[in-house]
Swiss-Prot record:
Record's compositionally biased regions (Polar residues): 166-190
Annotated spans, Disordered: 162-190
Site (Important for bifunctional activity): residue numbering on this chain: G116, F117
Family: Belongs to the dCTP deaminase family.
Keywords tagged on the record: Hydrolase, Nucleotide metabolism, Nucleotide-binding
Gene that produces this protein: dcd
UniProt subunit comment: Homotrimer.
Protein name: dCTP deaminase, dUMP-forming
Length: 190
């Protein structure tokens, strides 16, 4: 069940669903707007000949932190990792779904490539997979509304929520745009 604005506020007031910093003006009829942080991960195209999800490639991306008032320009065809300004903590019976903003989609900005689902039990900043599919550069401003989080109530609490020992959670507690840890999904034969 998708939570309404009243349900979202009730969960926040009860302390079960946490957003930091919380701004009540970001609550929409059935979602919460999320804002862009000032940190980005850019790909180092000259360090690797290709991306291999099975290998740890520590220098594949570099962290860029903007100075106050400075924008990030995402060029046509460009892809960069960003993150939400807000830190989210979901209880064991709520999950999230990150969606783009219609106004930005109409400009050619995609907020996430594939990973829009947030498991119950997650705590951290949400990493954004930002792509420019327009034919002109797009200016990204820290603090701007970049997407919206829909919150869904599970039929029962998760038995093994995100962050539990058996869940294999790789991104619990992440701060800023976190690079892929896909290599952890591959079994090492040593």
């Amino acid at each position: 069940m998708l939570l309404s604005d009243r349900d979202l506020r009730a969960e926040i007031t009860a302390g079960r669903f946490s957003i930091d910093p919380f701004d009540d003006t970001l609550v929409q009829p059935s979602s919460i707007d999320v804002r862009l942080d000032c940190m980005f991960r850019v790909f180092n195209n000259t360090r690797y000949t290709h991306i291999d999800p099975a290998r740890q490639q520590d220098e594949l991306t570099s962290l860029v932190e903007l100075v106050d008032g400075e924008p990030f320009v995402l060029h046509p065809g460009g892809f960069v990792l960003g993150s939400t300004l807000e830190l989210f903590t979901l209880p064991e019976d709520l999950a999230g779904r990150l969606e783009g903003k219609s106004s930005l989609g109409r400009l050619g900005l995609l907020t996430h490539s594939t990973a829009g689902f947030i498991d119950p039990g997650f705590c951290g900043h949400i990493t954004l997979e930002l792509s420019n599919v327009a034919n002109l550069p797009i200016t990204l401003w820290p603090g701007m509304k970049i997407g919206q989080l829909c919150v869904l109530r599970l039929t029962s609490p998760a038995e093994h929520p995100y962050g539990s020992a058996s869940a294999g959670s790789k991104y619990q507690g992440q701060r800023g745009p976190t690079p892929s840890r896909s290599y952890e999904n591959f079994i090492k034969n040593t």
